[in-house]
């Protein structure tokens, strides 16, 4: 995996975590 791909996937996982917190 390229470094950019890792950063993108990490960012997506962070956003999903925030969305889950807001939905609860």
UniProtKB/Swiss-Prot annotation:
Its Gene Ontology cellular component terms are: chloroplast
Q: Which UniProt keywords apply?
A: Antioxidant, Chloroplast, Copper, Metal-binding, Oxidoreductase, Plastid, Zinc
Which prosthetic group or cofactor does it need? Cu cation; Zn(2+)
Q: EC?
A: 1.15.1.1
One function term, GO molecular function aspect: superoxide dismutase activity
Going by the record, the broad EC class of this enzyme is: oxidoreductase
Primary localization class, coarse: plastid
Reaction equation(s) it catalyzes = 2 superoxide + 2 H(+) = H2O2 + O2
Q: What does this protein do?
A: Destroys radicals which are normally produced within the cells and which are toxic to biological systems.
Family, as annotated: Belongs to the Cu-Zn superoxide dismutase family.
What quaternary structure, including any partners, is listed in this protein's UniProt entry? Answer: Homodimer.
What name is this protein filed under? Superoxide dismutase [Cu-Zn], chloroplastic
Native organism is Picea abies
